[in-house]
Amino acid sequence: EWDTFAIPPYENMKPFDVLCFQYSLHVETQDGNLKHYNFFESKDCRRHFIEQLIQDLPKTGTILVYNMEGAEKLRLKQLASQFEEYREELDSICSRMVDLSKPFEAGLYYNSKMRGHYSLKSILPVFSKDVSYLDLDIQNGLNAVFAYRTYDDKDEEEKKEVKKAISTYCQMDTYAEYIVYHGLIEEVKNNA
């Protein structure tokens, strides 16, 4: 999961290209331990973003993403075209992605708590009563992008607060994916 900045302010970016400035990863090991990785930078951080993402992601295994075609996969392909030297590694990452939204989008799983929607925020309450976006300072991607757009205009203390709020929101997204994934596994076990 990462949030994006829609105005292309840097060299080698086209109109309406998106600047990836933040990501959050939760990596689950085979023994069930969960480790969180976070990246956040301002300015032109594309190269460092790519390098850190490649370093933080395990070299093998499935990468679960939610609604990946219009966001994560598209952005990585865009970065691969801007930085050819990373194309092979970014293409490899894309090839390991699996879209966690598909069972919900296809109607293979439905719960009335979803209220006819299948966004991550709509399905999280189905699988957890305790984890919620409602307590966060930033509760959606648009607010995260707006906060980022004003980031460089802030003083150092405000920057820390904005960075923490954006990072916490994005961390919630990837943790929610973890909860939903394990919730689906339990549903299959209990209803098989």
Please identify what each model-predicted range represents:
Residues 9-10, 76-78, 182:
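Short amphipathic alpha-helical segments
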Residues 1-49:
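Metal-dependent catalytic core segments for phosphate chemistry
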Residues 19-21, 57-60, 171:
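Short, well-ordered loop/turn elements at secondary-structure boundaries
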Residues 27-29, 35-142:
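Conserved DEDDh/DEDDy metal-dependent 3′-5′ exonuclease domain
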Residues 123-192:
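Acidic, Mg2+-coordinating catalytic module of metal-dependent nucleases/exonucleases
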